[in-house]
Amino acid sequence: MHWASTDKCLPLLPTNPNYSIYTLRHHMLELVIRAALEAGRAIMDIYTHPDTDWEVERKADNSPLTLADRRSHAVIAQALEQTPYPLLSEEGAHQPYDERKDWEALWIVDPLDGTKEFLKRNDEFTVNIALVQHGTPTLGVIYVPAKHVLFWGTQADGAFRAEVDPETLERSEVKQIPLTAEEIGECPYRVVASRSHLSEETQTLIEDLRTSHPDLDLVSAGSSLKLCLVAEGKADIYPRDRKSVV
């Protein structure tokens, strides 16, 4: 398959059949990282613009949908068209189960995770992109555009965190995670929970945890930022029941 970019802002995927699996994986990861960063930039253009129209639509499940959701989706969808895998996106076209049940690999995307946090303007929203192969996540990127922090990882190479320059989108201060105990330091038993979707079941679980961890510190956060806090060692557990929303 010939993979090539139609956007000069996005890296080309290699077409040379002699490239190693490692090189192909690296180019794929770089394309996805760049897509997440460009999507984050599109979101921030709307988030910071003084004349932004904050009109909100409602999807079938009554969750909010904004212009930023759509812009981010468009950026990511264009980038992922270069790859041989189909896209299942929170804001994309509905894919019937009979069609996608036979997909061996696919991209799963939430172009703006934490739309409620975006509307509250508390900076706790993310761009999420994952490649799932045979039911297993093998590559993932989470970008927190308002905080200029990027997380990424692959099944083969592990997970990493970096700071991002919002102007150039260049990465710096790259660290592999999980971090060492020395880097994390001493802290109380920390539980991270949803800021907008904290259910009674989750609250009960947290109180149960408090009996064995009297020093429990509850931290509320939005979107997939909660998972990033656990990955960084800034939280010990993210409890959620089946009815809750990430």
Place the predicted regions along the sequence by residue:
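Compositionally biased, intrinsically disordered low-complexity segments enriched in Pro/Arg/Gln/His
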Residues: L13-P14
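Acidic beta-strand-loop-alpha-helix segment within the catalytic core
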Residues: A130-C228
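Conserved small/polar residues in nucleotide/adenosyl-binding loops
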Residues: V245-V246
